[in-house]
Amino acid sequence: MFPIVEFCVSNLAQGSQEAKEILEKDPNLDVVEYGCLSYCGQCMQTMYALVNGEMVTANNPAELVENIYKFIDENELI
């Protein structure tokens, strides 16, 4: 089973769309977009995604991609 990376549509509009597009090219990830992930406070402050239900944050799309892969490696999800 591949790691699931979940994005909130509101956070995508705030800049994490670029990270989502990069991650969607990885066949070893399941990337999903939802209308809301119920992290509104976090969503307004920073870019984030949930990786297998755990929040990963960053200040820009490139850092978000890097942090997601780091989280996956550290937790041996692939």
UniProtKB/Swiss-Prot annotation:
InterPro entries: DUF1450, UPF0349
Similarity remark: Belongs to the UPF0349 family.
Name assigned to this protein: UPF0349 protein BLi03401/BL03152
Originating species: Bacillus licheniformis (strain ATCC 14580 / DSM 13 / JCM 2505 / CCUG 7422 / NBRC 12200 / NCIMB 9375 / NCTC 10341 / NRRL NRS-1264 / Gibson 46)
Organism ancestry: Bacteria, Bacillati, Bacillota, Bacilli, Bacillales
